[in-house]
């Protein structure tokens, strides 16, 4: 977490803003459920009450933070038309951020993991991205495919001229020896969303949702499952809603006994 939220040194620095950022990290960056986020909120509030009892804090900084509804996340995949508007706008305004978004869309790598991906993790020859266990959510090494469109953009933007030890998307969304936080990605995305008058349900993480939907529809849910590094198809299905839910083609054409 220290790579994504500015660390505090003294306990009195634990304020509402820091606690809120931490809970956003749990919900958005780790892609946890609303229930998990709320459980962390309850735990953090109890911890702060203990700090008050011991005289380390004067008031509880978590009290003003609300519990959120535990239904479906208020996040949706892009519509095809909006995805094209998004692409055309960024082609003109910020091709480096467009590369980041395209990378997220095709690889399904989580934003928190993307901040730690280095150029050395990419194989152009094999069109693969290695996700080390040290940065992955499930603490296991992973390998995902790198789409032709992403490689072309990287070559056009001269990304591979940077040192292999550079983080792929650092300051300015360019290769850098210093990583940035997921909040940097999120804040810029939100500005673009506002400019294009997109709904609040479009979030940076929606790029992954959209990519999973589109790959599942094009190549099948099993392919999408493996690219997303999900343990089973049921996890992948959570990213598909309504008309985006897939069915096996075999179910449409097999000859039954009835």
Where are these regions (language model features)?
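Basic, Lys/Arg- and aromatic-enriched nucleic-acid-binding interface segment
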Residues: 38-40, 53, 57-58, 62-111, ...
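Short, polar N-cap/turn motifs at the start of nucleic acid-interacting alpha helices
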Residues: 121-126, 199-200, 220-238
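C-terminal secondary-structure termini that scaffold catalytic or DNA-interacting sites
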Residues: 126, 156, 160-163, 171-176, ...
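C-terminal catalytic core of Y-nucleophile DNA break-rejoin enzymes
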Residues: 136-156, 165-189
């Amino acid at each position: 977490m220290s790579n994504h939220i500015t660390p505090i040194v003294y306990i009195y620095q634990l304020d509402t803003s820091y606690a809120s950022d931490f809970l956003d990290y749990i919900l958005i960056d780790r892609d946890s459920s609303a229930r998990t986020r709320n459980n962390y909120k309850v735990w953090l509030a109890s911890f702060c009450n203990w700090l008050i009892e011991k005289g380390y804090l004067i008031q509880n900084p978590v009290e003003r933070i609300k519990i959120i509804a535990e239904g479906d996340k208020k996040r949706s995949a892009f519509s095809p038309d909006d995805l094209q508007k998004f692409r055309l706008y960024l082609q003109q305004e910020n091709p480096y951020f467009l590369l980041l978004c395209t990378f997220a869309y095709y690889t399904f790598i989580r934003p928190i993991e993307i901040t730690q991906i280095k150029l050395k993790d990419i194989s152009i020859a094999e069109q693969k991205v290695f996700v080390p266990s040290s940065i992955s959510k499930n603490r296991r090494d992973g390998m995902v495919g790198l789409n032709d469109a992403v490689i072309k953009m990287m070559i056009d933007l001269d990304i591979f001229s940077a040192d292999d030890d550079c983080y792929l998307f650092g300051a300015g969304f360019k290769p850098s020896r210093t990583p940035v936080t997921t909040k940097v990605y999120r804040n810029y995305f939100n500005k673009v969303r506002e400019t294009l008058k997109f709904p609040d349900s479009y979030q940076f993480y929606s790029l992954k949702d959209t990519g999973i939907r589109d790959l599942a529809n094009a190549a099948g849910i099993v392919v999408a499952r493996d690219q997303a590094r999900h343990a089973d198809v049921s996890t992948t299905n959570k990213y598909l809603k309504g008309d985006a839910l897939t069915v096996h083609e075999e179910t449409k054409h097999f000859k039954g006994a009835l």
